[in-house]
Amino acid sequence: MLEARDLYCERDERTLFRGLSFTVDAGEWVQVTGGNGAGKTTLLRLLTGLARPDGGEVYWQGEPLRRVRDSFHRSLLWIGHQPGIKTRLTARENLHFFHPGDGARLPEALAQAGLAGFEDVPVAQLSAGQQRRVALARLWLTRAALWVLDEPFTAIDVNGVARLTRRMAAHTAQGGMVILTTHQPLPGAADTVRRLALTGGGAGL
């Protein structure tokens, strides 16, 4: 279980949220919503331990995140707004960097992400959407329980969004957890996703 307890965050003398508390249990996924500048990416960075809140605490499996950082990161898949891939490497080589023991599974993961036939193309030669798919192919490889995804559908077409949404649904059905930001609808998942709305100083589930 991931828990945010009484989080407070201020940026540039402006309160993004205060008193923000919620939990994400096994089998749940949460969509963080809010306007530009509401603090969606900031919240995800707090939840992954990439930044510290100005007040409050994040807990993983009942322990403060700062005390269990190593075990938490072994349970985490974080894909930020920037795909975090190496443009000089091929799609296959990028996945091998993150999943060196899964060589036989890499082509299938890339195919699931819509990159069949692009496995050995340097990422620098791929479109923005294809580069995003290289990062998202990790969803078919990772063994992490918690997925935190910042705008995963950017530059992804409708069919790709549907395929990724099905993968997230399968992950939560198996007891995984997903937290994501997106402005796009989640096809077939509207009734199962909890929405956390950041409203400028507060939030509501």
UniProtKB/Swiss-Prot annotation:
Bilayer topology: Peripheral membrane protein
Protein name, entry field: Cytochrome c biogenesis ATP-binding export protein CcmA 1
Entries under InterPro entries matching the protein: AAA+_ATPase, ABC_transporter-like_ATP-bd, ABC_transporter-like_CS, ABC_transptr_haem_export_CcmA, P-loop_NTPase
Keyword field contains Cell inner membrane: yes
Cellular localisation: Cell inner membrane
Domain ABC transporter residues, every copy: 2-205
Superkingdom of this protein's organism: Bacteria
Chemical reaction(s) catalysed: heme b(in) + ATP + H2O = heme b(out) + ADP + phosphate + H(+)
Organism: Salmonella typhimurium (strain LT2 / SGSC1412 / ATCC 700720)
